[in-house]
Design a protein with these regions (language model features):
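Asp-based, Mg2+/Mn2+-dependent phosphohydrolase catalytic module
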Residues: 78, 94-175
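Helix-loop "lid/cap" segments that line or gate small-molecule binding pockets
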Residues: 11-12, 31-45, 100, 133
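Metal-dependent phosphoesterase signature
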Residues: 18, 38-75
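Alpha-helical elements of Rossmann-like donor-binding domains used by nucleotide-donor carbohydrate transfer enzymes
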Residues: 7-10, 34-38, 55, 75, ...
Length: 175
């Protein structure tokens, strides 16, 4: 998520918006359109959320070369590949999700990708995860979902799935 935050900081600053790091992490998983709507409304600054989202996504794509795999998560993905259907359920856009998967050469591990552009109600609503389960033909109650943000954990629980907070995995790995 540090690359996302760098892209957000660069883009929001150009439009006079303030986006503190703690707020960024609190809104993790929320669609970029919704984040911008919230920030502009709270700060009384009018912006074109769609245009600014595309600017943020373009900045992210510039920075993507610095991205890498999360080893603890990729171990699970590699062990599960071919044994369990897997999907990505992201609050991001198609462009950024596909971009990072292609950059890390891991797109082939996933049977479906659902982004904020595929559903009506983004995280913390369960729609993103429910659509991912539907696309891989697995009942939600039989799904385990990995997430790195509080909003996403709430969405997983609302979908009736088992959540795994990858932040706990990362903290344990760094000890």
């Amino acid at each position: 998520m540090p690359i996302h935050y760098a892209a957000w900081c660069s883009t929001t600053a150009k439009h006079g918006l303030v986006f503190p790091e703690d707020r960024f992490y609190a809104l993790g998983g929320v669609s970029p359109f919704e984040v911008l709507r919230m920030l502009s409304e709270e700060q009384g600054i009018e912006i074109d959320s769609e245009a600014v989202t595309f600017q943020k996504e373009a900045k992210y794509m510039e920075l993507i070369g610095d991205a890498g795999e999360i080893p603890e998560v990729m171990q699970i993905v590699r062990e599960s590949h071919g044994r369990l259907p897997m999907a990505i359920a992201s609050g991001g856009t198609h462009e950024t999700v596909e971009g990072i998967l292609q950059h890390c050469v891991i797109r082939h591990y996933f049977d479906a990708i659902v982004t904020s552009q595929d559903i009506v109600n983004p995280k913390p609503a369960p729609d993103t995860f429910l659509e991912a389960a539907r696309r891989i033909n697995v009942a939600p109650e039989k799904c385990r979902a990995y997430e790195d943000a509080d909003m996403g954990i709430r969405a997983i629980l609302a979908a009736g799935m088992e959540p795994v907070d990858v932040r706990d995995m990362l903290a344990a790995a760094s000890r």
